[in-house]
Design a protein with these regions (language model features):
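Bergerat-fold GHKL ATPase/HATPase_c domain
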Residues: 1-67, 71, 90-94
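Conserved beta-strand core positions
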Residues: 46-48, 76, 123
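Short beta-strand element(s) in the Bergerat
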Residues: 73-78, 165
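Acidic ATP/Mg2+-coordinating residue in the GHKL
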Residues: 82
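A short glycine-centered beta->alpha linker in the GHKL/HATPase_c
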Residues: 86-88
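Mobile ATP-lid/nucleotide-binding loop of the nucleotide-binding subdomain
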Residues: 97-99
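GHKL-type ATPase core
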Residues: 103-218, 222-230
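GHKL/Histidine-kinase-like ATPase module
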Residues: 217-252
Length: 252
């Protein structure tokens, strides 16, 4: 009989301070980068789009000149889209298994998806991928109640369709939501800082960060606008010194 994990109990064991409110988003973006590492397509075709979604309710205020201006509002949902391998049988089975060893060589502990539910109400996943020479679509919700529906994979009766996986983090909880700055540029900087080891390899996919108010950043281009400093990384396993970008300039 397989061992099952109580999702609510597992999430309850996780400690996540409000200062680390963006870690669930970081986990999602890193998952997308790693998925693209494993797929055999040209780097120029690899792409990740991060949608930072604000509340649809528009708030306004009066500025010093008496003009009515729109105020920025909190991010309430995030959506990360990539064209990587997707939730095929192997990756989906790993998702269902706590402390999975599938990506242990990449430094993954196998509990990141539980981190999602510490800061968000639920996660919706929609993945279109190719397996056994057939196109499949897998769609499900992940919440404290587990995965629903359990039967969530279907074969698509088509010859070709875009490979795409969308992970939607829905319902940003407090105190995490209020701990994140409103500014999209600030979010861009934090994503670059967290994912810096991937950016300095030269093989990072195109990563676009955008909100639903018309602002956007190409993170691969943005990181070149940082001042240079020396960062020491230990690589396989000899220490190497690499020049990277860390202190911020304005991101335009």
């Amino acid at each position: 009989m397989p061992i099952t994990v109580n999702v609510a109990g597992q999430v309850g064991q996780i400690r996540l301070s409000s200062s680390k409110a963006l870690w669930p988003l970081f986990e999602t973006v890193v998952n997308s980068i790693q998925s693209l590492e494993d797929i055999d397509i040209p780097v120029v075709e690899k792409k990740i789009v991060i949608d930072a979604l604000r509340s649809e309710e528009v708030q306004t205020r009066q500025d010093a000149q008496g003009n009515i201006v729109e105020e920025q509002s909190h991010f309430v949902d995030f959506r990360v889209t990539d064209n990587g391998n997707g939730f095929d049988k192997s990756n989906y089975q790993s998702f269902l298994e706590a402390y999975s060893q599938l990506k242990v060589k990449k430094g993954c502990k196998g509990i990141g998806r539980f981190l999602w539910l510490k800061a968000f109400d639920k996660v919706t996943i929609n993945s279109t991928y190719i397996e056994d020479k057939k196109w499949h679509q897998r769609s499900f919700d992940f919440s404290l109640d587990g995965v629903k529906p359990e039967q969530n994979d279907k074969v698509l009766d088509i010859k070709e369709t875009p490979r795409q996986t969308i992970v939607s983090l829905r319902g940003f909880k407090n105190p995490y939501r209020d701990a994140v700055a409103y500014n999209l540029e600030s979010l861009a900087k934090k994503l670059i800082e967290h994912c810096l080891p991937y950016f300095i390899t030269g093989a990072c996919p195109k990563i676009i960060l955008q909100d639903n108010r018309g602002d956007s950043f190409n993170l691969v281009n943005c990181k070149t606008k940082f001042h240079s400093q020396i960062l020491k990384l230990e690589v396989n396993p000899s220490p190497k010194t690499l020049e990277v970008n860390s202190s911020e300039k304005g991101l335009q």
